[in-house]
C-alpha cells in the first residue's frame, strides 16, 4: 500500500464530523513535525462548537540574497466531513475505509482526506529530494469548512494578517476534478450574498380580503421582477451573477387565514462584474418601487476571487500535463470554499483535488487510480514553485 493511500485511510478512520476533528490534526502534526514544521494550534469558537485549527509552517534556511528570494506556498484544507446520513444505506461502514471495485469508500474519501494525505506525502518526498529548499511551505487545516466556517480558516487568516504573515501561493485541496484527477482546477470562485426578506401585511379572515392585506400577493410581483433581472453578463472568467430563492414561509397553517407576513430566503452567487453593495442597492430599489412594507437582513458569505493565469496556475498546469497528459480546464463554477478567506492575504489561490462526483453522498468514494497522481501533481508543483522561489 502506498504511503498516500495509507494516510488517506488513517484519516477516514477518524469520524471527524464538523466541528469535531477527532484527532486528525494531531495525526498530521506528528507527520509534519519531524520534517521541520512548526505546528501551532489556533483553535477557536465556543465550548459547544469548538473548532480545531492547525497552522504548520516550515521556514527555509535563508541568508543574504536568498532571504529576498524566498516565497511561501500554503496548502489549505479541512479535516471535517459532512454527516453520513442513514448509516444503514451505506454499503460499508462510513468510517471504515473499504476497497471495492477499484475505489476507496468512506466519508471524506474525496472531500477531502485524499487531498490532505496526497499533499503531506508530496511534501515528504519533496523534502527528501530537496532537503534545503528555497521555498517556505505551510499547511492551514481546519475542522470547520463544512459548517458555519466562522471559527476555522477565517479566524486563522485574521491572525496571520495581524502578524504580517506573507503568503504568495495557495493550493486548496477541494475536489475540483470531474472525470480524472487534474482535468479541472478552480482558479476563482463567485461571491455569495444571502438575504432574508420579511414582507409585512395584515392578517385576516380569507373570506374578507378587504379587511386584510395579503403579503404573499404583494410580494409576488417584486419577486417575479427579481427572478427575471439580468444582474450582469459575467465575463471571461465568471458566469453571469445568479439570484435564487431557497425558502418561502408564510401563513399560520390554517387554510382560512390570510397571513400577516411572508419570509423569503434568497441568495446571490455573484461575479466580479457586480459588488455586494451594488446588488443590495438594486434589490432595495425593486422592493421600494413595488411599495412593500418589509425588513431585509443581509449576510455576505464571501467576496468573489480570481487568480489569473500566472506563476501558480502555470506551475499547476505544467505539473498536471507532465503527470497525466491533460490540458486542464480553468473554472470558477460551483460553490464557495475557504479560498475566499485566503485570497484576502494571498494573491494567487487555486483549488485542485480528485473527482467530486460522490462528495456528500451515501457511499462517498475516490478511485484508487486518482490518489497517487494527485500526490505526484502536488509534488511536481512544489518542484516548479521552488525553482521560482530561487529565481
UniProtKB/Swiss-Prot annotation:
It catalyses: N-succinyl-(2S,6S)-2,6-diaminopimelate + H2O = (2S,6S)-2,6-diaminopimelate + succinate. Zn(2+) 1 binds at residues 78, 111, 174. Its EC number is 3.5.1.18. Pfam families: M20_dimer, Peptidase_M20. Pathway: Amino-acid biosynthesis; L-lysine biosynthesis via DAP pathway; LL-2,6-diaminopimelate from (S)-tetrahydrodipicolinate (succinylase route): step 3/3. Its cofactor is Zn(2+); Co(2+). Zn(2+) 2 binds at residues 111, 146, 360. It comes from the Bacteria. The active site is at residues 80, 145. Binds 2 Zn(2+) or Co(2+) ions per subunit. HAMAP family: DapE. Catalyzes the hydrolysis of N-succinyl-L,L-diaminopimelic acid (SDAP), forming succinate and LL-2,6-diaminopimelate (DAP), an intermediate involved in the bacterial biosynthesis of lysine and meso-diaminopimelic acid, an essential component of bacterial cell walls. Belongs to the peptidase M20A family. DapE subfamily. This is Succinyl-diaminopimelate desuccinylase. The lineage of its organism: Bacteria, Pseudomonadati, Pseudomonadota, Betaproteobacteria, Burkholderiales.
